[in-house]
C-alpha cells in the first residue's frame, strides 16, 4: 500500500474523550486476534460522519473505545498475550445504560468484529445497532 493511502493512527487528542468513570465493572474477554486484526485495532478509528458512533485508539496495549457524540469511555480493553483480555466497562447510568456483562460481551464482540474488518464499515455497524435496539424494544 502506498504511504499516502495509509490512514493516520488515531490517538487520544484526535477527538473529544472522557476518562473511564470510577463506576465501572471488569470482566475477562476470551478472544484471539491475528496480527492483521491487531494492526487494524492499533490504527484506531476517528469518526467521519454523524452515524459513525465510535472513536477508538490504542495506547500501549490498551484500547479505549469512546462514543463519538459524547466522548464517554464505554470500553477499555487491556490486551493480554494469553488472549484473556481485561475489559473495563462503564457503569455510570448517566453515560451508559447497559448493566449486564453478558450483553456487554456480545456487544463488544460485535464491535470488535466490525473494527477488525478492512475496511471498517461504520454504516453497517450503525444499522446493526439500530436493528438490535428495535429487537430489544419489541418493535421488530
Where are these regions (language model features)?
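Negatively charged, low-complexity tracts enriched in Asp/Glu with abundant Ser/Thr
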Residues: 2-62
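Polybasic, proline/glycine-rich intrinsically disordered low-complexity segments
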Residues: 83-140
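Canonical SH2 domain fold
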Residues: 63-81
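Short, flexible loop/turn elements at secondary-structure junctions
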Residues: 60, 67-69, 91-93
Amino acid at each position: 500500500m502506498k504511504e499516502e493511502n495509509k490512514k493516520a493512527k488515531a490517538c487520544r487528542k484526535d477527538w473529544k474523550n472522557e476518562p473511564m468513570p470510577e463506576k465501572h465493572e471488569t470482566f475477562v474477554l476470551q478472544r484471539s486476534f491475528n496480527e492483521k486484526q491487531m494492526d487494524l485495532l492499533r490504527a484506531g478509528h476517528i469518526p467521519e460522519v454523524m452515524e459513525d458512533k465510535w472513536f477508538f485508539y490504542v495506547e500501549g496495549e490498551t484500547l479505549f473505545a469512546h462514543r463519538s457524540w459524547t466522548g464517554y469511555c464505554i470500553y477499555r480493553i487491556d490486551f493480554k498475550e494469553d488472549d484473556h483480555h481485561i475489559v473495563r466497562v462503564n457503569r455510570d447510568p448517566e453515560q451508559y445504560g447497559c448493566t449486564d456483562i453478558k450483553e456487554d460481551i456480545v456487544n463488544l464482540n460485535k464491535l470488535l468484529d466490525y473494527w477488525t474488518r478492512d475496511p471498517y464499515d461504520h454504516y453497517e455497524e450503525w444499522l446493526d445497532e439500530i436493528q438490535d435496539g428495535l429487537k430489544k424494544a419489541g418493535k421488530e
